[in-house]
Amino acid sequence: MMFYYQVQDEVLVSREALAGVREITEEEASKAQRLIFMSRRVGAGKAAWLVSHKAYLAEAEEGLWCLDSNQQDVLARQVQDVPQWLEEKIAAGGVMGVCADLAQTQELLARKENADKKVVHILAMGDVGSTVLMALALLGGDCVRELGIYDFNERLCQRWEHEINQIAYPWAYDRLPAVRVLTEDQLFQCDVFVFCASKSIPAIGADVQDVRMAQYEANSAIISRYGVLAREAGFQGLFAVVSDPVDQLCCSVWRASNRDAMGNWDGEGLRPEQVQGYGLGVMNSRAAYYAKQDARFQSFLTEGRAYGPHGQQLVIANSVTHYDHALSMELTRLTVEANLEIRALGYKPYIAPAVSSAAISLLLTLRGEWHYSSNFLHGIYMGAKNRSTRNGLELEALPLPPQLLARLEAVAAELEKY
């Protein structure tokens, strides 16, 4: 049974009766421009998301079914009480799901997103951070108003402020976003915070097979501190993780922000969906690079997908509709080892990740377009194709072949260890 309620300008749908709000008829609810579906799994996942399939009304725990339309169809058949008009509203993208109680839901709905160009702040002006800055400055004029930068090295910040602000189109001097040097207490006065800090990157020639995981312990401590600062600032924007290992650091910052001063979990920090990891975009681009060079992989360019972390657990599918396990594993290996080829040439492989994974993917996020990033999924952060909508995060769901699904299950099991 469904209950319908009017709360200010929003219409809520719930399977449980709610006290203290005005109940309305189903006919009245059906006329609403959008609906807010209140899940009974309070605090068990993302606070808000797009209900993109009837399966979400089954209120199952988040999991890989969110990426698999086969499993979604099975779950949807368990939901018997959904009126036709509500199914049509879901198909049109007009239903937001919330995993919160009534008070938290009202607080979420009261937040008004900045509809104008965004303010983006970047932490750390090393190789990666400075490249992200350049790419955002040159490519983001349509959706970024200002770029704030912070680094412990003040001279480094001054250098980049001078350099980037002296790049301009003649007679269109405000076409590109301005760059401003920040103090640490200003870091979270923004719409998007981009974490590019890193304790250390293994030197060229170092005998390290998985460079990204070698950075985990040190970078986890750093990002946890900024999770606490985000909590203290009451930050409501997007916390974008660029440093390696991306997916594991997403978990680190989310957890750190939700513990009190005594280390006890209280859930008062960043919401799961506020944290996104930006590492998968370059792996998709690297797979496309090899697909262009070898006709055996050509199907990837139109039918392929990338999933998971951008490290040893990466999952590349040559095609979802015509999945070939052997080809997919070979293309995955080539993609994972692409950074080692750059290191063998004597260079650190940071330019393509900074632009493909971070800058381009961040801009696609702000524009509400499909891109690759890592998002919260039942306690882990899993990379997949997704987009941000007015009604929450939408994860792409495809009919995943059994062998591909098995690979994703193995990856999820590994990520659960962190």
Annotate each language-model stretch with its function.
Residues 1-116, 362, 366-369, 408-418:
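N-terminal ligand-binding/catalytic initiation module
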Residues 144-148:
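Short beta-strand element of Class I
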Residues 243-319:
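Rossmann-like dinucleotide-binding core of oxidoreductases
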Residues 152-190:
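Conserved N-terminal Rossmann-fold NAD(P) cofactor-binding segment
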Residues 175-236:
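Rossmann-like NAD(P)-binding element
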Residues 47, 53-76, 292-418:
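Long, compositionally biased stretches enriched for glycine and/or charged residues
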Residues 127-132:
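Hydrophobic/small residue at the entry helix of a nucleotide-binding pocket
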